[in-house]
Amino acid sequence: MDTRAVFLGVLGLVALVRLAEVIVSRARLRARPEALVAEPALFPLMVLLHVGLIALPALEVLGLERPFRPALCAAAAAVLVAATALRVWTLRTIGRAWNVRVVVPDPDAVVTSGPYAWIRHPNYLVVILEIASLPLLHGAWISALSLSLLNACVLSRRIRTEEAALSQLPAWREAMADRKRLIPGLL
């Protein structure tokens, strides 16, 4: 079996999921024309980051002939499965309020259950885990490292922007005051 072909197939599947997320998000924004979108200038960089998540590992694996390492793949796959489980839980919890854009919810739509009972931004934790682990399925460590660093820069700004927007809602401020951003009790 050609592990590179399987890896490229996984990247293709992730690309389709990302495209579906953008389509769903646009439809939700059209359904709420009054919605406040808080970070229009940052969004193109996020799109570029996620395009890079598909393109860079593929180029690294093919161009630099990264070998398939079963132990590394197994560890990366375990992280990816955990991240996917957290994503499903997060999206089921937040429901129709989820969007790829920073959209201020209605004041009565603040979510405090599911993973939001422990951290403010479970979906960003998912993205951190995905960006770190997806390239490592086939040893693309340069992609994992460089994309993780870029993601840290993007998320540091995006989280501040999102929290500034959500802090306009007293219910969000009160509910999230004692919760860490990404890791319960730590960060």
What is each residue range found by the language model?
Residues 13-16, 52-53, 57, 78, ...:
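Hydrophobic alpha-helical transmembrane segments of multipass integral membrane proteins
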